[in-house]
């Protein structure tokens, strides 16, 4: 089993990478001395596949296991579902000597993590991500929270897990669209942080699309290592960590405007990345060849690139409700060529939209 550590002093934690080793979860949790009672938060789809092996592993390690099943989908990442989780935690009698396991994708991880951060002023939690997007992004770094009708992730907290267990074999049961969505977040790291990793993805598209285990394990581990290096330097998004929002400013606007129902998160990010690449070129940060490479990779990964047809005013309203807006200015992430980035404050959002063909 391969391991990397997210180094955050007393909040440091390991990320374990493996293939077909969910049975190890119980012993890994026992090593962390998290307490004896655990609530596993999952959804019906993931639970049908993986709750039993997770439960058996935890029980065999001496834990008392409770199951919390919540609806599947981004539209349920809200205060109503969060209240249901609190109700179950209270009904089960979980105390500060208990912990939560988030078994699922990004929605489950975000909500279960936020419940852990706030229940009894904080109990430990463990991430067991079952989607590619969650494995390479949301399970690492401690961002937890829920959506508000006015925007995505407007309510939340930074709260680090005690460990993350990533088993790439669980991706075999992931729907194709969900899997491709995760490849968008993976590509993001290459575009703004690591040109060599971008080339690795570009050269191994077919292996990635076929879910080749060796290739996947290497790509997921590299993605997590890149994210961990950013989080270690800027845990609470005071500066550097904003690079991880590449493609997300426009992507979140797309999700908000479509009610979180038309696009998966990674699909919206892919649209945002395509537009960010065009904007970066227009602003002089990258070349047309760089933009062509980004758009080509997204195309090879079968990801959307075109903005849905909303008015400039609708896009501006959605973008200006984003948490990346500070003091009236929008902090926007531009790719500098491939493998590097710059962050600049944009006062005129309509200028960005015009570059994207909105409001010409």
From Swiss-Prot:
InterPro entries: Dehydroquinate_synthase, DHQ_synth_AroB, DHQ_synth_fam, DHQS/DOIS_N, DHQS_C. One of its GO terms (cellular component) is cytoplasm. Keywords: Amino-acid biosynthesis, Aromatic amino acid biosynthesis, Cobalt, Cytoplasm, Lyase, Metal-binding, NAD, Nucleotide-binding, Zinc. One of its GO terms (molecular function) is nucleotide binding. The lineage of its organism: Bacteria, Pseudomonadati, Thermodesulfobacteriota, Desulfuromonadia, Geobacterales. It holds the Pfam family DHQ_synthase. Its EC number is 4.2.3.4. Pathway: Metabolic intermediate biosynthesis; chorismate biosynthesis; chorismate from D-erythrose 4-phosphate and phosphoenolpyruvate: step 2/7. One of its GO terms (biological process) is aromatic amino acid family biosynthetic process. It comes from Geotalea uraniireducens (strain Rf4). The keyword Chloroplast does not apply. The keyword Metal-binding applies. It is found in: Cytoplasm. NAD(+) binds at residues 72-77, 106-110, 130-131, 143, 152. Its cofactor is Co(2+); Zn(2+); NAD(+). It comes from the Bacteria. It catalyses: 7-phospho-2-dehydro-3-deoxy-D-arabino-heptonate = 3-dehydroquinate + phosphate. This is 3-dehydroquinate synthase.
């Amino acid at each position: 089993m391969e391991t990397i550590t997210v180094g955050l002093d007393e909040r440091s934690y390991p990320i374990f990478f493996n293939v077909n080793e969910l049975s190890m979860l119980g012993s890994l949790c026992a090593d962390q001395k998290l307490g004896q009672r655990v609530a596993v938060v999952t959804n019906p789809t993931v639970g049908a596949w993986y709750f039993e092996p997770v439960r058996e592993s935890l029980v065999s390690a001496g834990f008392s296991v409770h199951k919390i099943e919540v609806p599947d989908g981004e539209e349920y990442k809200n205060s109503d579902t969060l209240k249901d989780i609190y109700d179950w935690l209270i009904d089960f009698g979980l105390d500060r000597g208990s912990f939560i396991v988030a078994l699922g994708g990004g929605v489950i991880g975000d909500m279960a993590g936020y419940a852990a951060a706030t229940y009894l002023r904080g109990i430990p939690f463990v991430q067991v991500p079952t989607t590619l997007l969650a494995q390479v992004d949301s399970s690492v770094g401690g961002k937890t929270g829920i959506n508000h009708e006015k925007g995505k992730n407007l309510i939340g907290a930074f709260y680090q897990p005690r460990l993350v267990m990533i088993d790439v074999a669980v991706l075999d049961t992931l729907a194709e669209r969900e899997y491709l969505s995760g490849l968008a977040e993976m590509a993001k790291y290459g575009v703004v942080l690591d040109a060599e990793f971008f080339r690795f993805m570009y050269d191994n598209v077919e292996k990635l699309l076929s879910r080749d285990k060796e290739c996947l394990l290497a790509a997921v581990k590299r993605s997590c290592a890149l994210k961990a290096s950013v989080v270690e330097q800027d845990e609470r998004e005071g500066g550097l960590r904003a690079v991880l929002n590449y493609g997300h400013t426009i992507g979140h606007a797309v999700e908000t405007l479509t009610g979180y129902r038309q696009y998966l998160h990674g699909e919206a990010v892919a649209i945002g990345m395509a537009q960010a690449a065009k904007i970066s070129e227009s602003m002089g940060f990258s070349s047309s060849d760089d933009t062509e490479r980004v758009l080509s990779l997204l195309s090879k990964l079968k990801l959307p690139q075109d903005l849905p047809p909303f008015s400039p005013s609708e896009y501006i309203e959605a973008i200006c409700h984003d948490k990346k807006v500070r003091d009236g200015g929008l902090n926007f992430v531009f790719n500098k060529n491939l493998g590097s980035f710059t962050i600049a404050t944009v006062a005129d959002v309509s200028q960005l939209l015009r570059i994207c063909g909105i409001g010409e």
